[in-house]
């Protein structure tokens, strides 16, 4: 009998805590996993107490997932190396802006044969353009990565409301174990091999959701939002066909939870849409609204739009992605939000 696998969750925000609820419960009842699940918590003080202390005594992340009890076998650890050094499975769930620094701290301090799964929605820039977050982790830590993406608004997952998700595996032999770690009766997992397409969907849909929020802020209706979703999906597929080079890009992957389902839920719920709507209504900057509305959580859509803009500019492809470009120009270049509607009206799909 193989020794039970030790699991560490890197991150403890809204999504990290929701996943800790699932992983903790599954590890507690499956002999393939060690009963204790460590969760690295970036230490902060909440009402005069350390967040790790609150989580370990009251079993609740009162800052990022209030009102939900975490399993008692989830142990909050403030030291990243201490949390991750013995893990066989590393679950990455932090804002994509922090991944480089986190991996640098872990480098040389983890098991060589560990495997990783990234739940991080975003992309990085490499010297030749696009770099996937899972590739950044793989290069820095030398471990084989998978990814998990889907229509998974964290609070609904924590409420155990039914949803689906997609795991993309670079090494398909890791799929069954990761599925056992993640799947519950209300969190259904499909495993596919196109890990790069799964991951790119998770990043790009946040840009489209910003556009959906602009439409809401301008008072347009569901027909307009449906057009944003459709045109956004077309740009996501076109982008994947250019930049996902690990293998063929099949349309079927976009019909998984990581694709069209995640795009829909994010364009109707989710923080990117909410903040983009407020951006139109208040005239405040994205940075101001992030501080005011998200209580320490990070917004992924505008930052991803900026990275994608630079990648497309580098490849001379900006004209082929007018929706992505418009979101960037409005968020960062002071262009009027009304430009977003003309971007839809004049989209090359209609020419």
UniProtKB/Swiss-Prot annotation:
Belongs to the NAD-dependent glycerol-3-phosphate dehydrogenase family. GO terms for molecular function: glycerol-3-phosphate dehydrogenase (NAD+) activity; NAD binding; protein homodimerization activity. The gene is gpd1. The lineage of its organism: Eukaryota, Metazoa, Chordata, Craniata, Vertebrata. InterPro entries: 6-PGluconate_DH-like_C_sf (IPR008927), 6PGD_dom2 (IPR013328), G3P_DH_NAD-dep (IPR006168), G3P_DH_NAD-dep_C (IPR006109), G3P_DH_NAD-dep_euk (IPR017751), G3P_DH_NAD-dep_N (IPR011128), NAD(P)-bd_dom_sf (IPR036291). Homodimer. One of its GO terms (biological process) is carbohydrate metabolic process. This is Glycerol-3-phosphate dehydrogenase [NAD(+)], cytoplasmic. It holds the Pfam family NAD_Gly3P_dh_C. It comes from the Eukaryota. It catalyses: sn-glycerol 3-phosphate + NAD(+) = dihydroxyacetone phosphate + NADH + H(+). It is found in: Cytoplasm. It is an enzyme of class 1 (oxidoreductase). PANTHER family: GLYCEROL-3-PHOSPHATE DEHYDROGENASE (PTHR11728), GLYCEROL-3-PHOSPHATE DEHYDROGENASE [NAD(+)], CYTOPLASMIC (PTHR11728:SF32). Substrate binds at residues 121, 271-272. Has glycerol-3-phosphate dehydrogenase activity. Its main location: cytoplasm. GO terms for cellular component: cytosol. SUPFAM superfamilies: 6-phosphogluconate dehydrogenase C-terminal domain-like, NAD(P)-binding Rossmann-fold domains.
